[in-house]
Amino acid sequence: MAEYRYDVVVIGAGPAGEGAAMNAAKHGKRVAVIEDKSQVGGNCTHMGTIPSKALRHAVKQIIQFNTNTMFRDIGEPRWFSFPRVLQNAERVIGKQVKIRTQFYARNRVDLYRGRASFIDENRIEVRGGLNGKEVLYGKQIVIATGSRPYLPEDVDFTHRRIYNSDSILKLSHTPRTLIIYGAGVIGCEYASIFVGLGVKVDLINPGERLLSFLDGEISDALSYHLRDNGVLVRHNEQYDSVVGDDHGVVLTMKSGKRIRADAFLWCNGRTGNTDNLGLENIGLEPNARGQLAVDNHYRTKIPHVFAAGDVIGWPSLASAAYDQGRSASSEIVKDDFFRFITDVPTGIYTIPEISSVGRTEAELTEAKVPYEVGQAFFKDLARAQITGDTVGMLKLLFHRETMELLGIHCFGDQASEIVHIGQAIMNQPGELNTIEYFVNTTFNYPTMAEAYRVAALNGLNRIF
């Protein structure tokens, strides 16, 4: 059996694996990446971020067409099937795979296809590839295997009407009614997508409120707009059984309620991809969710074995995963770019979308920080009035004494783009992080960025 030696071996070709591999290669290291799928990109490209956001964009265009009175002269509203809309996502996936495959080739990173399993702390067996079994020796190893939907054993996911957040992309028809169990980020995003296609959606939330990690006002705005669009949200409900038949799926909840729909989508939790990695051979034990523990340098308890991305849990975002992988690699090559990823912007691609960075009002109140609030409502902005995307707001939280920007929370069209303007100021050192920047800066007009000036003036007017 052939054995190949590398400075760095990365398991997984998703965002975290790509970040780790590219950074190590650019520092002159000999790098290998092991990927068990036929194409690079990981769950992000094939099952998660890219397809779901491409779906969302297509649905948003349909909604804009159907709600714009100008287009009524053309005819009646247009409706598209889920498979038809999915075709747009498939085109984007192909483009992403092509680009990312070129990254590996251009940086001379060796790609091995197959399933990875540790033999010992430095050697990894690759099985199922074109060359049968191969062994890679890595001086340093990065585990970046990602995650998959958590699937409870008492739900039959082999039933043709019961889906999880990965298999939903294989849906071959548009259901009239849909039950979504789990009201986290993925559940809320798919609720927006399906209700935009005219599907009647029941969103079952085991918790007390939607996306409780968000600022309360933003969470409330999401709840209102989902309901306003026709989503029925049920809080504090846990499933008792999920039973599918030839005509639909019946969800029975522990409260005694029973709901029937054409299809059922499970969106409640994810599990790290650590099974079958042979971790027992090196003394690593994942937690109950299959996630690995790391220190502030992304090291596991084995000094030369690192982990990054969804496989270590929070925040389980593609953007953070790439930076985590790059930072783990920075620790390996000892460059000057290492940072432990903490203050990550959140992008939630509901319709309208949500984005935030920094602290919430509840966190600042609990910490007894003297803060003030500045608000800008999209309905008052000329650019939003022009585009018709008037739903939403920008909310700035700042220290009322030092004027330091503490939190940015945005709900509405382009929220995930808008938030980065404020993030750039929040990341400035010392007195350069100030809300007064937005008052003393000239913004293009009309733009959505102007919301920062409006919100800053609104907040400063509250200071006395």
Curated annotation (Swiss-Prot):
Enzyme class: oxidoreductase
Predominant cellular place of this UniProt entry's protein: cytoplasm
Cofactors that this protein relies on: FAD
GO biological process, one term: NADP metabolic process
Cofactor note: Binds 1 FAD per subunit.
EC number: 1.6.1.1
Pfam families: Pyr_redox_2 (PF07992), Pyr_redox_dim (PF02852)
SUPFAM superfamilies (alphabetical): FAD/NAD(P)-binding domain, FAD/NAD-linked reductases, dimerisation (C-terminal) domain
Keywords tagged on the record: Cytoplasm, FAD, Flavoprotein, NAD, NADP, Oxidoreductase
Catalytic activity: NAD(+) + NADPH = NADH + NADP(+)
Positions of FAD binding: 35-44
Disulfide linkage: none
GO cellular component: cytosol
Gene Ontology MF terms: dihydrolipoyl dehydrogenase (NADH) activity; flavin adenine dinucleotide binding; NAD(P)+ transhydrogenase (Si-specific) activity
Subcellular location, record wording: Cytoplasm
PANTHER family: DISULFIDE OXIDOREDUCTASE, SOLUBLE PYRIDINE NUCLEOTIDE TRANSHYDROGENASE
Biological role: Conversion of NADPH, generated by peripheral catabolic pathways, to NADH, which can enter the respiratory chain for energy generation.
Family per similarity comment: Belongs to the class-I pyridine nucleotide-disulfide oxidoreductase family.
Stated name of the protein: Soluble pyridine nucleotide transhydrogenase
Gene: sthA
